[in-house]
């Protein structure tokens, strides 16, 4: 959320929408879209980037999501079928099915959002973009042998 001053001089909260795609091999965010409103075009753009980035995957790809409206769009499901990507969805009302992504959102909020006030969409968008670079390149994880997601990927590609 970011805050803007309304016509009456009071601060008004505005939402920002983040649609990330995570590779579960190493928890790396491979693509994302940030917008001021939920956007089918933005989600499709992030989907296309995730497909491009993972195109050399030697195994069947599975894209998991919650049951949000965007992931049920015909254009979204058609694109997955064209690429022979299996679509997996969380059960309705069960955040545990999407716990890896929920964990990422929790870290993001804890590390750049709580206790900070953002005064514009651009300020918050930039902070999120910078955090995703930090998360991928520098934020170590115990489950990855104390490596960052990008370091873990490079280590396994070199092997």
What would you call each of these model-derived segments?
Residues 1-159:
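Charged DNA-binding/catalytic regions of mobile-element recombinases
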């Amino acid at each position: 959320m970011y805050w803007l001053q309304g016509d009456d001089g009071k601060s008004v909260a505005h939402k920002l929408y983040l649609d990330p795609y995570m590779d579960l091999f190493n928890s790396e965010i491979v693509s994302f879209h940030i917008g001021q409103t939920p956007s089918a075009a933005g989600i499709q753009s992030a989907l296309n980037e995730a497909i491009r980035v993972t195109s050399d995957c030697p195994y069947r790809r599975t894209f998991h999501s919650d049951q949000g409206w965007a992931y049920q769009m015909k254009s979204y499901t058609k694109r997955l079928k064209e690429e022979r990507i299996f679509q997996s969805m969380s059960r309705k009302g069960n955040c545990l099915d999407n716990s890896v992504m929920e964990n990422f959102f929790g870290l993001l909020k804890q590390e750049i959002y709580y206790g900070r006030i953002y005064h514009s969409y651009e300020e918050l968008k930039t902070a999120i973009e910078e955090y995703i670079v930090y998360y991928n390149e520098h934020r170590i994880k115990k489950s990855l042998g104390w490596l960052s997601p990008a370091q873990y990927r490079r280590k396994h590609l070199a092997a």
